[in-house]
């Protein structure tokens, strides 16, 4: 047990934990927040805000591809 804890607290283990956390944030957390933001603001955004949206989609594109098979962002049907 001490060996495992010592390995995780060493510089290499700490660096691996930081890389894992950052990669999970880049591939899952930020794209999920971006999907939510785009869904809420897409039809009411100003032109500058839309430019920022396009940049964020470009920046987090790999994560958006990872999440795309499980999300459905089609517009809702209009009430008839």
UniProtKB/Swiss-Prot annotation:
An example molecular function term from Gene Ontology annotations: oxidoreductase activity, acting on NAD(P)H, quinone or similar compound as acceptor
Keyword terms, alphabetized: Membrane, NAD, NADP, Plastoquinone, Quinone, Thylakoid, Translocase, Transmembrane, Transmembrane helix, Transport
InterPro entries per UniProt: NADH-quinone_OxRdatse_su_L
UniProt keyword Metal-binding, yes or no: no
Record field: transmembrane: 14-34, 51-71
Record's bilayer topology term: Multi-pass membrane protein
Record's subcellular location: Cellular thylakoid membrane
Family classification: Belongs to the complex I NdhL subunit family.
PANTHER family: NAD(P)H-QUINONE OXIDOREDUCTASE SUBUNIT L, CHLOROPLASTIC
Function in brief: NDH-1 shuttles electrons from an unknown electron donor, via FMN and iron-sulfur (Fe-S) centers, to quinones in the respiratory and/or the photosynthetic chain. The immediate electron acceptor for the enzyme in this species is believed to be plastoquinone. Couples the redox reaction to proton translocation, and thus conserves the redox energy in a proton gradient. Cyanobacterial NDH-1 also plays a role in inorganic carbon-concentration.
Name listed for the protein in its UniProt record: NAD(P)H-quinone oxidoreductase subunit L
Taxon lineage: Bacteria, Bacillati, Cyanobacteriota, Cyanophyceae, Synechococcales
Gene giving rise to this polypeptide: ndhL
């Amino acid at each position: 047990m001490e060996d495992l804890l010592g390995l995780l607290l060493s510089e290499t283990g700490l660096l691996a934990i930081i890389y894992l956390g950052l990669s999970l944030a880049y591939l899952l957390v930020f794209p999920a927040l971006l999907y939510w933001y785009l869904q809420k603001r897409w039809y009411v955004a100003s032109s500058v805000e839309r430019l920022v949206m396009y940049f964020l989609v470009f920046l987090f594109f790999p994560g958006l591809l990872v999440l795309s098979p499980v999300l459905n962002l089609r517009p809702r049907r209009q009430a008839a």
